Amino acid sequence: LPGEVCVNMTNVTHIDGTDVRQLTKAEFICREQMDAIVEFLREFVPGYERCYLVAAADNVGVRETRHFKGVTTITPEDIVEARVFPDWIATKNYFNFDIHSVVGPGLDKNGAQREFRAKGNYTIPYGACVPEKIDGLLLSGRNISGTHKAHSNFRVMGICLGIGQGVGIAAATAVRQGVLPRHVDVAEVQRQLQAVGVTP
């Protein structure tokens, strides 16, 4: 909307994103930070002297918690080398490594790399969405199998949407084929994705 700006500046560390009590603590910390951010904008940013908070997210966003171990684990090298996996289910992915500090504010020393250079777009393999030891389950979004650094790349919304589309089609295909998700005919999933314009 004209006159409104989305600000994404709150940050909390040393919180277990799987513990509801600690998440509640993080909510309080972030809400206190919002007041400080508004004051900062009013004092130091021209044009924001009379700014005020219009709305905030209902819940704190958790960037990273535990990682599943999948049949395939995505690595930073897969991303930089623009790997096209034979069992791809999400394509045309490109983003930098956006590693936030786990000990304080800002980015990790390896954070948002301004000199990031990948050879091109990479794909998400179906194997990263299939847990190594759990049957009847598919992973989608930021919880797929990948290293900490790779996760900082594929956890963003655009890539997660593509993963969700591929995994959703795979789940429906597993039901139609009457098989466990790990035994899905990935070529059939890819045919359905290609039918709606998703290509490697």
Language model segments and positions:
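Flavin (FAD/FMN)-binding glycine-rich loop and adjacent Rossmann-like elements that form
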Residues: 1-200
